[in-house]
Each structure stands twice: as C-alpha cells, then as structure tokens.
C-alpha cells in the first residue's frame, strides 16, 4: 500500500504514541484534583504547556486545548463574532478556508453578520490590495489560512498581520494546520492560530488554539474546570503531552524532512510535465509537500479510484470538500472549468520512499496510456 495523502492525515509517530500510552498509564489522575496524583498530573500539564508555548514562541496562558481543528475553528468564528458584535458584524474569509470556518461563518449570517470572501491574485495568494479595499470600520475578523490545503500555496500572513494592526477591533486568525513542520512559523502578527496535530504525526481528536492575551472569546463549551476560561472540560493530559512531542519532532526535524520531500517533489513534477494532457496546478509559491495537477478531460474521481485499485492512496481534493465540487483555487489560477473539476492532489512525507514514487509513476503511466487509448 502506497500512501500519498499526508495532507489529509498523517500516521502517529511512534515516539508520540509512546508518550500518549505511557501518560495514560502513569498520569491518569485529574490535574484539577488536590491529592498527590492530581498534583503530579498538574505538574506534567504545566511543564508540557510551557514547552509548547516556547516551541511556538507564545505565552503559556495563550494556549487553549481543544478536540481538533474543527472545534477550534468553530470557536474562533462564533466566539469572536459573539464577543465583538457590538463593534461590527463584518467578517472576511479568504477563498481558501476550510469548511470548519466557512460553515459556522455562513450560519452567522442568520444572526445578521455579513461574510465576504477575499479574492486571490494570479498566483493563488490572497490579494492584499483587494483586502485593503474590503476592510471596513465594522470588520471584526479576518481569517486567512497559512498554507492552503489544495495547492499548498503559502499565504502572506505576516504582511496581512501588519496591515490589520491599523484596525483596533479587527481580529486576525490563521489556520496553520498545513504549516507546522513544513515552513518556518512566526505568529507575532496574528491574534488567533489553529493547530491540528494529526497533520504533523500527532493524535487525531486533539487540537490547539493560540489566543493572544488581548483577544476575548465567548466560549462554545461551558462547565467544568480547565486550563482556560474559554474552553471547559478536564484537560486530556496524555493528548497534551503527545502534542508537545509531535511539535518537538516536527520543528526540530523540519529542515531534514523538507530536503527529503523536495527530492520526491522534483521527481514527480518533472515526470508529469512530460504528459501533454497533464497540467501542474501547484506553483513556485507552493510547499514541496503538496502537488496538485489536472488530467484534462478526466474525471478526478475515476483517477483516484484507479489508483486505489492499484493500492495507491491520494485525493481528488481536500477530504472535507464535496467530491463533485470544482476547485476554487485551481479555477482562480487557470480560469479553466475543466482543470478545476479534474484536479487531484498528491501530498508527500519524509516517510515516502523513492520506490513508492517510482511505483506511483509507473501506475500513472498505465492509467494515462489506457486513457489515451479510450479504455477509461
């Protein structure tokens, strides 16, 4: 089995899993309990939080642990909207945002909020000039992903953050799910950050929100002591310790892992470019971990099924999008309906091997020849 869908989910690193299992055995007590085992768990929790904060260059009291990116993004959208609605009801999202941001934002329109999408420039980045024109005095939230999950294009987060400093009541959020462990991170100009450990070899069902001290939220989940006022519930210490380990490995090994992936990226793209009916959608602003391409006049679902039957796992688009929906980003770059409805995504890892790449290219060649000969 060849797995080329690491942007959807990654396997849990053995070191991370060991930390999680051991913590479940050794530190299962409630960190809020006053007895000796509770105090030991609290000590481990504080140590892990301090470590996570240092790795991300934020403050310990700016960490909010959640059940995953979907909860985190819902907390961001609904929590900010309901806290700052007296200052305005205008929300700006990039055209690249995950459904866990788009859906709650859309639901807020029923409460009188206005949601607009920021256009992209010719390179697939948020158009800064368009953003400048769209920001209003009543804009309370701007959300732009750090790295889009379809083409892997790195967005100008720092530049946007600088721009938004001029607007006192406008909060800036980024979903950094695809960025951790892949590009250098700097959240100094961002107010809220979503982090998803299952994208960097951590546990599924675990999430993190960085909320800067000056930002306030209306919580979604209330009742019960936690590490913060903004998200109730007993802290899941084993998951938090596992998150710390996953972050450690992702950040410390980033350069080495990226070198491995860059090699495989070049192998795949150079070969795909030799096929006349293939169009590479990813560009020079994309991370090496994601390759998006279209096979003209080919149903992307058929291609994914063909690969799956040959024990190769990849995606037609992001896992959370409807299967028949065209890619907004591919269309923004190519202005082609065909390319936007036939795009597929390969996402790589340091765990990928040269043998796996060779096998994928072999199977792809078979598919292409069958397509040209009308057998598909």
Specify the residue positions occupied by each region the protein language model found.
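Pyridoxal 5′-phosphate
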Residues: 1-376
């Amino acid at each position: 089995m060849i797995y080329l869908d690491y942007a959807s989910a990654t396997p849990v690193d053995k070191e991370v899993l060991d930390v999680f299992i051991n913590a479940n055995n050794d530190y299962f007590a409630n960190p809020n309990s006053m007895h000796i085992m509770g105090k030991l768990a609290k000590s481990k929790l504080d140590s892990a939080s301090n470590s996570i904060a240092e790795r991300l260059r934020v403050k310990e009291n700016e960490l909010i642990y959640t059940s995953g990116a979907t909860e985190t993004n819902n907390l961001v959208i609904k929590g900010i909207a309901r806290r700052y609605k007296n200052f305005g009801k205008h929300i700006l999202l990039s055209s690249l945002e995950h459904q866990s941001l788009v859906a709650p934002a859309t639901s807020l329109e029923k409460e009188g909020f206005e949601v607009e999408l920021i256009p992209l420039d010719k390179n697939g980045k948020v158009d800064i000039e368009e953003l400048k024109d769209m920001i209003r005095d009543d804009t309370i939230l701007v959300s732009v992903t750090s790295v889009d999950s379809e083409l892997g294009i790195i967005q100008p987060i720092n530049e946007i953050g600088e721009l938004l400093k001029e607007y006192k009541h406008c909060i800036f959020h980024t979903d950094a799910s695809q960025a951790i462990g892949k590009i250098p991170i700097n959240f100094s100009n961002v107010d809220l950050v979503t982090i998803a450990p299952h994208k960097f070899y951590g546990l599924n069902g675990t999430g993190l929100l960085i909320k800067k001290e000056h930002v306030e939220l209306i919580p979604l989940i209330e009742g019960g002591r936690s590490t913060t006022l903004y998200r109730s519930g007993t802290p899941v210490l084993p998951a938090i310790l596992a998150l710390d380990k996953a972050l450690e490995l992702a950040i410390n090994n980033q350069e080495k892992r990226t070198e491995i992936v860059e090699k495989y990226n070049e192998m795949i793209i150079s070969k795909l470019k030799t096929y006349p009916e293939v169009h590479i959608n990813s560009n020079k602003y994309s991370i090496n971990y994601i390759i998006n391409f279209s096979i003209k006049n080919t149903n992307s679902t058929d291609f994914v099924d063909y690969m799956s039957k040959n024990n190769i796992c990849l995606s037609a688009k992001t896992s959370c999008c409807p299967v028949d929906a065209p890619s907004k980003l591919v269309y923004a770059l190519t202005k082609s309906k065909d390319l936007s409805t036939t795009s597929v995504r390969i996402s790589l890892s340091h765990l990928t091997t040269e043998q796996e790449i060779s096998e994928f290219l072999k199977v792809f060649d078979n598919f292409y020849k069958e397509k040209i000969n009308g057998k598909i």
